[in-house]
Amino acid sequence: VMLMWAANGELDCQARHIGEFGNYTIYKENEAAGDYTTVILNRTKCDGLHMNLTTKNERLRALFNERDFRLACSYMFNREEYLEFIYEGFGTPKQYTPPEGSPLYYEKLANAYLEYDPDKANELLDGLGYSERDSDGYRVYPDGSGDRVSINYLAININATQTTEMLADYFRDI
């Protein structure tokens, strides 16, 4: 209902609950009829992977705290493909940092480890001792055992399901 109010020009200002990028086309198509303007704010939006570095599972905690594991996760993620699919090509790949123009912006950090390189991701994981795989093709611990890893997301994000599915595919690829 709120989406239609916005598209009809019945709201003065609203972003929460309707500000998902998937609604952008609806708003742009209805600007003239609704007598409003759609504005894309210059802000930092972070769709990201956040590890539970303090999980009670000691083996996962050790893995998640390995710098090379986190780098492998960064290299496995195809940010260009993701932006094209989820945000119709809008956006610029960056690490989760303050935006350009902020006095806290640090370009080297913002652009670190952004390249999509599944070969490098595989090399890093192999180097950590996770080179063996089970019969389903999933990596296992050096002792041959495995763990399940859950990907949790906030369902309030309209793109959360697609984001999680893409992330799971990237993990499967490495």
Task: Give residue ranges: language-model regions.
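Extracytoplasmic/periplasmic ligand-capture domains
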Residues: V1-E88, T92-P93, G101-I174
